[in-house]
């Protein structure tokens, strides 16, 4: 007999049948996390493989959505009443926090896929009560369904919120495609407690690529560094975290002042009254968290950050009152009812000038956050703040532009923008590329140019490496980089160590000569951009290598790229794209705390590659000889320049014994197991394809007797994918 309380599967009432217990990654945490290369699988997507969000968005009645959002702003709900009778400030915070996770160093985070709906973001302390904002939006999302993504709706709600309170926004672009599970590739920090700050070392040096001061915060601690109410010290944190989100000092001041022109924070009582976050809340709460037992738990009794601050006398109307109040008073430290540090005017000044959010008969004194006072007491911020105070029109313009940048920074080029409110002005941070202004080359010209390239004296590795260097800057995280624009010939890319500047100049000079000669003599208005020619040269090199290896392949090439200018290229903005490691070229700039194989997986994930695509590209690039500095590490072949499966057959050969090279833990020597005769050298990136069980399984496919043709075809397909990663025009077609 089986007791009703006993699980019929495991025989134990306390056991779980899925996902519990020690995973293999718990047992062996140093193995590379290959799951990031298969996240967001079609199997997790309820929309199906044929769903085209861009086409659905074009069917959207955009004006109707905005009208519904505008009506929602003042339709206060009993279950979560609107502060001051207006939900605008709540939706501004929701949109800000959706976009504000973006960081420049790896392009991850941001609003681009609606990740605020999922853990960990949906349960971050800094996102307290934003679950209510999304539930308020659900009737509108339900009404318009697949025609607008959650990712777009959250940002649009923030825009409409601003407009409904009298602010003129810079514009809005749709095109953010929802994902359906949490991101696994984003490193949010190593801390295992909320608000932990192990991310700092030395003199408050923030760990890369993080852009927030503590675990679970979007940017900074509003009470000050580690809760210490020091406005000047807080300014240092503000400057660093906002810079890591691509904001300069002026944009930072505009965003803080503009955002804090509206609404309030919530700290009506002690945090001990607040229940668990959404992911830890009981099932009957249906995904809502932070249930409070303080009074009614809502409205005037709401507890959020623990701070109880209302910045201006007009919290639902755009004004310059934030700066007026900031500079009109001398401030003294106080505490909120929840015990959080905040500031109020000295000697009771300003009493009765600020409305209460839920009781029209009550009036309050102005209050400010420690980080608000940073705008007055940091000398650089103070100068900017006073300028905006004296020039409110310039504040409005700066805030509009900074808000647009904040909410669109991770969308990539303007070609991805959708909708009737896309601004006409091209902005430098959008990495602009000129529109095609000539007739594109066709099959005949492509064949002619391939012959010219292959007869130019450039080697196969030089052709392949240059194209790879150009295209592989692409980041699927924020859709930046790629071959379009030919920015590899411009600063800063032309000087990056990984691109071997001297070798690059030689290759580009030859290709530019071919380009100029062709463009002078071609008929019918046909021209070729250098961006196209660089990719075509790489494709020609792959084709030649395949031929040398005995394979007949067609390497896809589609023209349509254009050449950007140096004036269209923000050197500082592009500097963050410089690879510190590129395992595909066997390049490692220096020793890092993270292993070379983990850095390879990270690079592959940014290139949107699967584990098989990563594997086949490594194997092909090695035998072609496309390695940094012409190093022979990983070139496991006696026929370099020929596309063969030699990398895999030799790596998996049990006749080879590998040992680390003395003094270099990242390099290994492979010797004949019987004679001890040296055969090959390889890096950790090379050897992981024989050491890791999953990667070895893939490598075995390509090393098999019947695997060489599949290897050649798969390599060409993966190569073509990387060359076209930034061709959003092709994806739309």
UniProtKB/Swiss-Prot annotation:
Entry annotation: catalytic residues: 97 (proton acceptor)
Organism: Methanoregula boonei (strain DSM 21154 / JCM 14090 / 6A8)
Required co-factors: heme b
GO biological process, one term: hydrogen peroxide catabolic process
CDD domains attached to this UniProt entry: catalase_peroxidase_1 (cd00649), catalase_peroxidase_2 (cd08200)
Keyword Oxidoreductase listed: yes
Function: Bifunctional enzyme with both catalase and broad-spectrum peroxidase activity.
Positions of the record's site feature: Transition state stabilizer: 93
Protein family membership: Belongs to the peroxidase family. Peroxidase/catalase subfamily.
Pfam families named in the record: peroxidase
Region (Disordered): 1-24
Enzyme Commission number(s) from the entry: 1.11.1.21
Catalytic activity: H2O2 + AH2 = A + 2 H2O; 2 H2O2 = O2 + 2 H2O
Residues that, per the record, bind heme b: 260
Cross-referenced PROSITE patterns: PEROXIDASE_1 (PS00435), PEROXIDASE_2 (PS00436), PEROXIDASE_4 (PS50873)
Domain of life according to the entry: Archaea
GO terms, molecular function: catalase activity; heme binding; metal ion binding
Any one of the GO CC terms: cytosol
Subunit structure: Homodimer or homotetramer.
Protein name (database record): Catalase-peroxidase
Cofactor binding notes: Binds 1 heme b (iron(II)-protoporphyrin IX) group per dimer.
UniProt cross-link Tryptophyl-tyrosyl-methioninium (Trp-Tyr) (with M-245), position: 96-219
Sequence position, cross-link Tryptophyl-tyrosyl-methioninium (Tyr-Met) (with W-96): 219-245
NCBIfam families documented for this protein: cat_per_HPI, PRK15061.1
Post-translational modification remark: Formation of the three residue Trp-Tyr-Met cross-link is important for the catalase, but not the peroxidase activity of the enzyme.
PANTHER family named among the record's database cross-references: CATALASE-PEROXIDASE, HYDROPEROXIDASE I, BIFUNCTIONAL CATALASE-PEROXIDASE
Keywords: Heme, Hydrogen peroxide, Iron, Metal-binding, Oxidoreductase, Peroxidase
């Amino acid at each position: 007999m089986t007791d009703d309380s006993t699980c019929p599967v495991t025989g134990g009432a306390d056991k779980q049948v899925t996902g519990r217990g020690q995973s293999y990654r718990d047992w062996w945490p140093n193995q590379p996390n290959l799951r990031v290369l298969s996240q967001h699988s079609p199997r997790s997507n309820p929309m199906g493989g044929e769903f085209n969000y861009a086409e659905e968005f074009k069917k959207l009645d955009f004006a109707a959505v905005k009208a519904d959002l505008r009506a929602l702003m003042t339709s206060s709900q009993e279950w979560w009443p609107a502060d001051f009778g207006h939900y605008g400030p709540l939706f501004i915070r929701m949109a800000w926090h959706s976009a504000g996770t973006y960081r420049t160093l790896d392009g991850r985070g941001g609003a681009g896929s609606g990740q605020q709906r999922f853990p960990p973001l949906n349960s971050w302390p800094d996102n307290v009560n934003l679950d209510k904002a999304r539930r308020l939006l659900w009737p509108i999302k339900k009404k318009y369904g697949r025609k607008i993504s959650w990712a777009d709706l959250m940002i649009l709600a923030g825009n409409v919120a601003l407009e409904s309170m009298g602010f003129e926004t810079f514009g809005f672009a749709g095109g953010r495609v929802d994902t359906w599970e949490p991101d696994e590739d984003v490193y949010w920090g190593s801390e295992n407690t909320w608000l932990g700050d192990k991310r700092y070392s030395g003199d408050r040096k923030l760990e890369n690529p993080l852009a927030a001061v503590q675990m679970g915060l979007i940017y900074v601690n509003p009470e000050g560094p580690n809760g210490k109410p020091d406005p000047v010290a807080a300014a240092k944190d503000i400057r660093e975290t906002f810079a890591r989100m691509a904001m300069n000092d002026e944009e930072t001041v505009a965003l803080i002042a503009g955002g804090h022109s509206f609404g309030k924070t919530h700290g009506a009582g002690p945090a001990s009254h607040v229940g668990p976050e959404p992911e830890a809340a009981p099932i009957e709460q249906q995904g809502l968290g932070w249930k409070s037992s303080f009074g009614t738990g809502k409205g005037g009794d709401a507890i959020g950050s623990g701070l109880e601050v209302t910045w201006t006398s007009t919290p639902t109307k755009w004004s310059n009152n934030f700066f007026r109040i900031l500079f009109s008073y001398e401030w003294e430290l106080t505490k909120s009812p929840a015990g959080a540090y905040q500031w109020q005017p000295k000697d009771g000044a300003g009493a009765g000038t600020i409305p209460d959010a839920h009781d029209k008969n009550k009036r309050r004194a102005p209050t400010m956050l420690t980080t608000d006072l940073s705008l007055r007491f940091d000398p650089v911020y103070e100068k900017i703040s006073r300028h905006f105070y004296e020039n409110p029109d310039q504040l409005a313009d700066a805030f509009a532009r900074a808000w647009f940048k904040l909410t669109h920074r991770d969308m990539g080029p303007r070609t991805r923008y959708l909708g009737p409110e896309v601004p006409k002005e091209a902005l430098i941070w959008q990495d602009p590329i000129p529109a095609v202004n000539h007739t594109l080359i066709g099959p005949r010209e492509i064949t002619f140019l391939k012959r010219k390239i292959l007869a130019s004296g450039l080697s196969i590795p030089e052709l392949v490496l240059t194209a790879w260097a150009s295209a592989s800057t692409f980041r699927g995280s924020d859709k930046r980089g790629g071959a379009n624009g030919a920015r590899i010939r411009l600063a800063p890319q032309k000087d990056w160590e990984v691109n071997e500047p001297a070798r690059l100049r030689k290759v580009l000079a030859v290709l530019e000569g071919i380009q100029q000669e062709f463009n002078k003599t071609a008929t019918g208005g046909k021209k070729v951009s250098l961006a196209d020619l660089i990719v075509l040269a790489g494709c020609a090199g792959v084709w030649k290598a395949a031929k040398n290896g005995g394979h007949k392949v067609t390497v896809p090439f589609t023209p349509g790229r254009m050449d950007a200018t140096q004036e269209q290229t923000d050197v500082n903005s592009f500097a963050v794209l410089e690879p510190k490691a590129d395992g595909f070229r066997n390049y490692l700039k220096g020793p890092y705390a993270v292993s070379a194989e983990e850095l390879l997986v990270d690079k592959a994930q940014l290139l949107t590659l699967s584990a098989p695509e990563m594997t086949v590209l490594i194997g092909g690039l090695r035998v072609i000889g496309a390695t940094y500095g012409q190093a022979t590490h990983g070139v496991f072949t006696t026929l370099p320049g020929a596309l063969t499966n030699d990398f895999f057959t030799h790596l998996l050969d049990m006749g080879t014994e590998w040992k680390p090279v003395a003094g270099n833990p990242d390099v290994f020597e492979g010797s004949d197991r019987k004679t001890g005769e040296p055969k090959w050298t390889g890096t950790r990136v090379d050897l992981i394809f024989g050491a890791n069980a999953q990667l070895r399984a893939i490598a075995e496919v390509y090393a098999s007797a019947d695997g060489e043709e599949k290897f050649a075809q798969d390599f060409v397909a993966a190569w073509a994918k990387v060359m076209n990663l930034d061709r959003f025009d092709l994806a739309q077609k």
